[in-house]
Amino acid sequence: GAYMFYAQKNTDNTYMLSVNGACHATAFNQHSDRDLKDNIQVIDNATDRIRKMNGYTYTLKENGMPYAGVIAQEALEAIPEVVGSAMKYQDGASGSEGEEGERYYTVDYSGVTGLLVQVARESDD
């Protein structure tokens, strides 16, 4: 049968939780404290960057359900810092190191929010 969720340790020593379906919570919080960050820079040319992306509605192939969002390949051109990748394994896979899977792009939408904030700031100028 299909998995409900799995966790894996990535080769860069980060961890990923994959959920087959929707996740519901009151909040999903990311670390954002200035004290945790180095090399802080305002996003330059935010308006030009956002114009490299479109907002889309689409149907997800794996479940046929409608969604809205961005395309990772466009985000990669606009602001590569928000694009990552993950592995998708076949049903029944153990996720063991070296096991075959399909790599696909992911988008950190909170990073896209940072870009949108800066677009609004640029429109004030």
Identify the meaning behind each predicted range.
Residues 4-6, 117:
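Ordered hydrophobic segments in well-structured contexts
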Residues 1-4, 14-16:
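Structural detector of coil-to-beta-strand junctions
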Residues 102-125:
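Long, leucine- and charge-enriched amphipathic alpha-helices
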